[in-house]
């Protein structure tokens, strides 16, 4: 009986540990290369492995990006969308790239974006760089991730069209 109870408690603890939520503040700087214009925003990000991500913007207030399973919902610049990523390849790459980069699964993100991968570590900061092997209609031309103690602290997503978005995460 004690062994069964102990086993049940261990299984429950393992499930709870796997379902932990990570939450922090973030800043975002979106740079449009053609004009040099930089659009800044900030908010709170909440991630629960493996497929729950919420970015709630406090500036501009009311904007959000929510990933829940295969669904991706956002309100950006007054445009609301709701997409089933199982039926939309462009948004599936965006969804998977965000989830994999936040989770530290950069090998899969590189594979999804057909990118070469390099990883280095200096002074406790792991830097991951992914560079697309060729131009593509979807995905990212370059991705840079920085992690400290397994948590993402910086993410740069460069699109083929010349838009670069940098996120800084503050725990």
Report the location of each language-model feature.
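Short, surface-exposed coil-to-beta transition loops
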Residues: 39-42, 60-61, 68, 138-142
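Gly/Pro-enriched, hydrophobic low-complexity segments
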Residues: 119-171
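Positively charged n-region of N-terminal signal peptides that target proteins for export
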Residues: 1-4
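Short hydrophobic/aromatic-rich beta-strand segments that constitute the beta-sheet cores
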Residues: 26, 53-57, 72-75, 128-130, ...
